[in-house]
Amino acid sequence: MAQHDPIGLIAPNAGLAQLNERSREIFRQIVESYLATGEPVGSRNISRLISVPLSPASVRNVMADLEQLGLIYAPHTSAGRLPTELGLRFFVDALMQIGDLTEPERQSIQAQLSSVGRAHTVEAALGEALTRLSGLTRAAAVVLTAKANVRLKHIEFVRLEPERALVILVAEDGQVENRVLTLPPGVPSSALIEAANYLNARIRGRTLAEARLELESLMVQNKAELDQLTQKVIAAGIASWSGGDGEDRQLIVRGHANLLEDLHALDDLERVRLLFDDLETKRGVIDLLGRAESADGVRIFIGSENKLFSLSGSSTIIAPYSDGAGHIVGVLGVIGPTRLNYARVIPMVDYTARIVSRMLGG
């Protein structure tokens, strides 16, 4: 603790939870000013904003104590103060009053997503949810959905070259996925047709994971039913469904351009460039979002709490959504600067996740 405390604003041996009301008010004003402007705020401005009459000198003393506690810091370019990541976390956890969506906002989100959900695929509805969320929060919106939970309807093989074919997977909800398959040498078109017929008779209504297990078992039992080349096509098709790390997950991002708004300096531009680079590292984003699938409700990662975006100084607010059986099947949320309007964004993410769950019957 700082040695000066002439008016007793901070109790002796104070931890973060023991800040008294005056200290909390000064700290709250520093954070709220940062969230609104992105700029450091000085003691003179703080003394005008707080409800208790304190001189700028007295405010500076309290700010020095807050700085020693690790809640605020002085950027080298300014005499004012900004909140640290620890300070932002303390603000979000202990001081922030989470707002609520207005009834028109709720109705607008629900009506727009429900209309898309009735007329289009789940993927289209999720994309619309992200577009809406990105527009409301002025941040980038992301969704991670489990492709493994999609139930299959139809498969088709289309030859591209003598040893390459396109595998077209059609899901019951209308999603279509294409994958390029390497064919064994000498496979005739008849083998592609036979393989498609064999698979279509057995995969309908199954998830990718269920279909893989079923077909791997059947291929061992029923080798005599299929010629050798058709067996190879089916085996190659099954292998293509397995994919690599994260291939059973689909990542959708909307609203990159929002991150370019309100840049204050070259440092901000570099931060956004790093964030764009991070968003392109899909494996890392998938890992991050996957951490929220076991959570109940909204999760918030601020700055270096999230290793993926630590260099870009970004925050992530995410929430899981469920299917008709109540199983968590994906995560959605927003990624933006650490000065996100947390009180407004948190209920937006939470409500959007609830509406998506309702659309899926969850």
Swiss-Prot record:
Protein name, UniProt field: Heat-inducible transcription repressor HrcA
The UniProt record lists the keyword Transcription:
yes
Q: Name one GO biological process term.
A: negative regulation of DNA-templated transcription
GO molecular function: any one?
DNA binding
User: Per its UniProt record, what HAMAP family does this chain match?
Assistant: HrcA (MF_00081)
| Source organism of this protein record | Rhodopseudomonas palustris (strain TIE-1)
Q: Which PANTHER family match?
A: HEAT-INDUCIBLE TRANSCRIPTION REPRESSOR HRCA
Gene name for this UniProt entry:
hrcA
State the protein's purpose: Negative regulator of class I heat shock genes (grpE-dnaK-dnaJ and groELS operons). Prevents heat-shock induction of these operons.
Q: Does the keyword rRNA-binding apply?
A: no
- Write out the similarity annotation: Belongs to the HrcA family.
Q: Any idea which UniProt keywords this protein has? A: Repressor, Stress response, Transcription, Transcription regulation
Listed transmembrane segments: none
Q: Name one Pfam family in it.
A: HrcA
Task: Read off the NCBIfam families from this record.
Answer: hrcA
